[in-house]
Amino acid sequence: MPYQNILTAFDGSALSVKALEKAIKFAQDHAARLEVIHVCHIPVPVFGGPLYAAPFNEDKDYLLAAQAIIDEAKRLTSQLPDVQVILKQGQPALAILEYAEESGCDLIIMGSRGLGGLREFVLGSVSHHVVQHSKVPVLIVK
């Protein structure tokens, strides 16, 4: 059964560009709808007690950077007729999985972060978490 609704995660990195290119090809080959998601994770610093909210300017900087990434995704997908580019805020892996379920996508395509070694073991990766918890197939592009 061909894919009908493809979701790709995009963060502006070289690997996410490769993943988006693969997603565009899949969408064209299967006459599928393509959705591109970028998740803006604004960290909340904790200093040994109550939460400290980041100053508004820091939040604004994150959102401006996110908008630049969204604009790049729109530019890269401009040749497709039925593309939706979505900006979410939160933990990237959780937001991707939540949106995948909400949107009814039947394939997720994303780049491998490639943290490697100890960093990936300790920190994990967005792609690893998505692969482990997704209810639909996930294609990881390296």
Residue map of PLM features:
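Small/aliphatic-rich secondary-structure junction motif
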Residues: 2-53, 80
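Active-site phosphate/pyrophosphate- and oxyanion-stabilizing loops and adjacent acidic/basic residues
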Residues: 24, 71, 75, 128
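General small-molecule cofactor/ligand-binding pocket signal
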Residues: 37, 84-88, 139
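Short beta->alpha linker loops
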Residues: 68, 87-91, 113
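Gly/Ser-rich helix-loop-strand patches that form or flank binding pockets
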Residues: 98-142
